[in-house]
Amino acid sequence: MRILEKAPAKINLSLDVTSKRPDGYHEVEMIMTTIDLADRIELTELPENVIRVASHNRFVPDDQRNLAYQAAKLLKERFQVKKGVSIMITKVIPVAAGLAGGSSDAAATLRGLNRLWDLKLSVEELAELGAEIGSDVSFCVYGGTALATGRGEKIRHISAPPHCWVVLAKPTIGVSTAEVYRRLNLQQVRHPDVQAMIDAIEEKSFQKVCGQLGNVLESVTLSLHPEVAMIKNQMKRFGADAVLMSGSGPTVFGLVQYESKVQRIYNGLRGFCDQVYAVRMIGEQNALD
């Protein structure tokens, strides 16, 4: 038997860090939404009791470092599943980009194995399991648009943002999320108004959403990696309505209301950045199929 699952990327429309917890994690408030840039996960049942992960992308690990592997291992151990599975990951989301590609692959694996192994778990139960794998996995199990709090595992669904285009550009650098958080000084950064973003989304006001974009991690990453700031400036110059870094970076996204502007922005960025994408905002939970 074979199961196919879609694993869409997410962007942060608003990302605030409110405090550091005793366990080393940070308390966050994030508005996350899914976009139409997705990996494909193919799950095939194996007769032997093993987990095999494969991908055509050489940057995708095929062992326990892979979050999809961890998702399968968690389900096997928690529910005493004696069957094996082959997990084929077709990567479309760039790796280590701040777009939750690995987390979304893990979430898709949880959803798919729930069907393949007939575990009959609810989406809420899958999301709770996802939180054991990584902070973004809970959101990715659901998809759509949500306010994430705690360390990112507490999910409250909100309306989808107004429809628009999203242009993304990822420079060829790596960003250490741990270093970004370590350098973050919560007293010296401008904190986004997360509630104002929720209100803008509920009003379906594209202009207000653009006005409330904010990421408390952005100033840290920009200070470490000037290339990210350069991409932000170029994206604005080419005509994006609003521009922000996603997650801890290095990917920058621009919101674009009118399709007529998208190609110019895309072409302009392709002149100096290899990984550029122009996709639609999804933002709805039922859009994963």
Swiss-Prot record:
E.C. number: 2.7.1.148
Catalytic activity from the UniProt record: 4-CDP-2-C-methyl-D-erythritol + ATP = 4-CDP-2-C-methyl-D-erythritol 2-phosphate + ADP + H(+)
Residues annotated to bind ATP: P94, V95, A96, A97, G98, L99, A100, G101, G102, S103, S104
GO terms assigned for molecular function: 4-(cytidine 5'-diphospho)-2-C-methyl-D-erythritol kinase activity; ATP binding
Active-site residues, Swiss-Prot/TrEMBL: K10, D136
Gene Ontology biological process terms from the UniProt entry: isopentenyl diphosphate biosynthetic process, methylerythritol 4-phosphate pathway; terpenoid biosynthetic process
SUPFAM superfamilies on file: GHMP Kinase, C-terminal domain (SSF55060), Ribosomal protein S5 domain 2-like (SSF54211)
Pfam families with a match to the protein in the record: GHMP_kinases_C, GHMP_kinases_N
Keywords: ATP-binding, Isoprene biosynthesis, Kinase, Nucleotide-binding, Transferase
Pathway: Isoprenoid biosynthesis; isopentenyl diphosphate biosynthesis via DXP pathway; isopentenyl diphosphate from 1-deoxy-D-xylulose 5-phosphate: step 3/6
PANTHER family the UniProt entry points to: 4-DIPHOSPHOCYTIDYL-2-C-METHYL-D-ERYTHRITOL KINASE, CHLOROPLASTIC
Family from the record: Belongs to the GHMP kinase family. IspE subfamily.
Protein role: Catalyzes the phosphorylation of the position 2 hydroxy group of 4-diphosphocytidyl-2C-methyl-D-erythritol.
Record's protein name: 4-diphosphocytidyl-2-C-methyl-D-erythritol kinase
Organism of provenance: Bacillus velezensis (strain DSM 23117 / BGSC 10A6 / LMG 26770 / FZB42)
